[in-house]
A protein has these predicted regions:
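Short gly/pro/ser/thr-enriched loop/turn and capping motifs at secondary-structure boundaries
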Residues: 42-45, 99-101, 118, 228, ...
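Short beta-strand segments
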Residues: 73, 93-95, 114, 272, ...
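A short helix->loop->beta-strand "cap" motif at the edges of active sites that frequently abuts
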Residues: 86-92, 106-108, 243, 292, ...
Length: 586
């Protein structure tokens, strides 16, 4: 028996590859295993290779596995492009229809099974996925009851006949594999687990749930990969809190609607990806100038321009910090996994209202669309804090006929914020430079005072946990620094290095702007070499760190920009190279 294994299904896009992986993963989640799933797919509806890789474990996992134990292949291309992940004790279960051939250098065992032919005998080739799931069950010695329950839940609305024939396809696949088990070399059975029940969700769903838990009642957005699932989640769930979602004509309309709703006192947000954020920049500046709270979710993808819409990248960082024209107060935070996405999204809504400025939650495709185990969420962990909002009438002197000082020059830069309709709170609002009442002003002294007031709000800002750190060594050989979805690969690769006697500390940065300089500097001082891991060509995170931390003599970039996520073995191999260089320097 194994403590963990990796399973992948592959074929042509539009053939149910995603749903096949979803059925397998959901069943394993119900059996209380820990999971990490990642889909490879193209920017098209049908055609082209796609796959869904699921890592299943008796203990928590946070990264894509380096290798592959079981490959379900519906065509030859799936074998050709994935066999390099397999070992001698791995297995390929291939559809006989594809007339599969092992490529040169492929050491895995190949078993042909009539997935499509069996499905056609039952009525339709579409059920080949169920036949494959059944074969997987037999190979892994899994009871099919959980799969049968899932099939019943999935197809009950289509009638008993549809449920029955899909369960029959499942069992036919099970029997096909059972008859071939004597030929199998290797162990594909998992150890049992006594873990408590847990969730299995994509990062975008966690973001949507976090927004609702934070009290958001309005979202405006335009569909874009890989952010659309946030909007889809909100559409499905926001009515439960008497909220609404508007699909706008473009991203400019989306962000300005969100600003308007926030001005009216409703917690509101928008979500998009790089191209959409480019269109939103002027409006984000409006949020900063008018000191109107705004939460924006940016799920990064491959750029520039249309770029690689369905591939992994982290190349929007500089734009998120410096993209608007002019200087505005702005907060940029970055979750480290799906669970953190829930909590940090909740916190983002608090920050937006407390500091009256735009807050960008920076995700990436791997975190947003990757699916992973999430422990039971604590809805009371983050208290809703609305800052200096005024929702009841303001008592003013009878002879005070002037506008309310919405932009009063306070010591911390945060001014009282009456929502429209509050008696005594009338004020002017404009994107033009303004005085304390909001009226346009070009006075040099007023400009200086208002600019300093706005920027003063975030000068000392440090969120509750600006980094997620593992600083177990006072004299580390290597400090790995990353952000967003690189956490899992860094964590696992670093654990391997530590086991080999190479002392490694790690940091995932959650607060990117304003930058938590002192926290990072302390960690840097404890390491001989600092390696910044990120998915972009220029090393944007490394540049931000260099701008804020005394680190130039020990920093090294480790960038990847081919659209694929970092794997644990890449972090491990990089660490070995660095450790060798350190020894040679001594």
């Amino acid at each position: 028996m194994k403590p963990q294994l990796s399973w992948k299904v592959g074929g042509q896009q539009g053939e149910g590859i995603e749903s096949t992986g979803e059925i397998f993963a959901t069943a394993m989640n119900r059996k209380r295993y820990y999971l990490y799933g990642y889909r490879h797919f193209s920017s098209r509806i049908k055609g082209g290779h796609t796959n869904n890789k699921i890592r299943v474990s008796t203990t928590p996992v946070h990264a894509i596995s380096d290798d592959l134990d079981i490959l379900i292949a519906f065509d030859q291309e799936t074998i050709d492009v994935n066999h390099h992940e397999m070992r001698e004790d791995s297995i390929i279960l291939a559809d006989a229809k594809a007339k599969p051939v092992k490529p040169e250098g492929c050491h895995a065992q190949l078993i042909e099974l009539p997935f499509t032919a069996t499905a056609k005998e039952l009525g339709t080739a579409l059920m080949k996925n169920m036949v494959a799931i059944g074969a997987t069950s037999a190979l892994m010695n899994l009871n099919t009851n959980t799969f049968e329950e899932l099939i019943t839940n999935m197809f009950s609305k289509k009638g008993d006949k549809v449920v029955e024939v899909n369960i029959q396809a499942l069992n036919e696949g099970y029997q096909l594999m059972q008859s071939r088990l004597p030929e199998i070399d290797g162990d594909f059975e998992l150890e049992s687990t006594d873990a408590l029940p847990h969730l299995y969700m994509i990062g975008n769903d966690a973001i949507g749930l976090g927004a609702i838990a934070a009290g958001s009642q309005f979202m405006a957005a335009y569909p874009i990969t890989p952010a659309s699932e946030v909007m889809e989640y909100m559409i499905a769930n926001i009515s439960k809190v008497n909220g609404a979602v508007i699909q706008t004509e473009d991203e400019i309309a989306a962000v300005t609607m969100a600003i308007g709703a926030n001005y009216g006192g409703v917690r509101a947000f928008t979500a998009s990806a790089g191209p959409g954020l480019s269109l939103m920049m002027e409006a984000i500046g409006l949020s900063g100038m008018t000191e109107t709270p705004l939460v924006i979710i940016n799920t990064q993808r491959g750029g520039p321009s249309t770029g690689l819409p369905t591939k992994q990248e982290q190349s929007d960082l500089m734009q998120m910090i410096y993209g608007t024209h002019g200087d505005i107060p702005k907060i940029v935070v970055a979750p480290t996994d799906a669970e953190d996405a829930f909590y940090l999204t909740m916190e983002a809504f608090n920050l937006a209202e407390q500091y009256q400025c735009p807050v960008i939650v920076l995700s990436d495709l791997q975190l947003s669309l990757g699916k992973q185990t999430v422990e039971k969420l604590d809805y009371n962990r983050i208290e809703i804090k609305r800052g200096e909002i005024i929702q009841s009438d303001i008592e003013r002197e009878e002879d005070d006929k002037g506008y309310f000082k919405r932009y009063a020059l306070t010591s911390n830069g945060v001014s009282p914020r009456p929502i429209p309709g509050v008696k005594g709170g009338i004020h002017h609002i404009t994107g033009v430079e303004h005085n304390e009442e909001g009226k346009p002003s070009e006075s040099a002294s007023n400009r200086q005072q208002q600019m300093e007031k706005r920027m003063r709000k975030i000068e000392q800002l440090v969120i509750e946990s600006p980094v997620e750190a593992n600083l177990q060594h006072e004299d580390a050989d290597i400090l790995y620094i990353g952000f967003i979805s690189t956490k899992g690969a860094i964590q696992e690769g670093s654990n391997r290095l530590n086991q080999q006697g190479i002392k490694v500390n790690t940091i995932q940065i959650r607060q990117l702007h304003p930058f938590p300089t002192s926290v990072i500097q302390d960690a840097v001082n404890k390491a001989k070499k600092v390696v910044v891991v990120e998915h972009n060509y220029l090393g944007q995170l490394a540049s931000i760190i260099k701008m804020n931390v005394n680190i130039h003599d020990k920093i090294e970039n480790y960038t990847k920009y081919d659209g694929t996520p970092f794997l644990p073995h890449e972090i491990e191999e990089k660490g070995k190279i660095i450790a060798t260089e350190i020894k040679e320097m001594v």
